[in-house]
């Protein structure tokens, strides 16, 4: 249900750090939104450190684009901005000015995961009951 695309300077994060960040982002999102962790996706993409600019000047920040279903209030969106950012800084030792995080909301009916159309915001309980078997299959696959 959520996709966090983390764009980082090439060779700036080792595998253990990526694992810790993915786990932290997943756990924050799952706790704030109250969804199973299997519906949180995190991907890391490395970019050439000389290819990123801010204000026309070279910059080597880490950029996180979080895509999630629309409908969450400003308090929830605020938590989804501040908590992953704080986790990132805690895991990496980076300072807040070294990370840029934005959220992109999409209509749930424009989203699909594991072959299932996703529920509209507020309809998760009914949807979960209707897809118990598929969700169990996803959990068993890891």
Predicted regions and their residues:
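A domain-level signal for the structural core that forms small-molecule/cofactor-binding pockets
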Residues: 1-142
């Amino acid at each position: 249900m959520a996709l966090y695309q983390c764009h980082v300077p090439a060779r700036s994060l080792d595998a253990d750090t990526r694992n810790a960040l993915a786990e932290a982002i997943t756990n924050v999102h799952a706790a704030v939104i109250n969804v199973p962790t299997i519906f949180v996706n995190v991907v890391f993409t490395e970019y050439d450190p000389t290819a990123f600019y801010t204000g026309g000047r070279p910059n080597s920040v880490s950029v996180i684009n979080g895509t999630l279903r629309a409908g969450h209030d400003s308090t929830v969106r605020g938590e989804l901005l501040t908590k992953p950012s704080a986790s990132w800084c805690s895991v990496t030792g980076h300072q807040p000015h070294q990370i840029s995080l934005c959220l992109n909301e999409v209509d749930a009916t424009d989203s699909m995961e594991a072959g299932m159309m996703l529920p509209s915001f507020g309809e998760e309980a009914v949807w979960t009951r209707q897809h118990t078997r598929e969700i169990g299959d996803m959990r068993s696959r890891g």
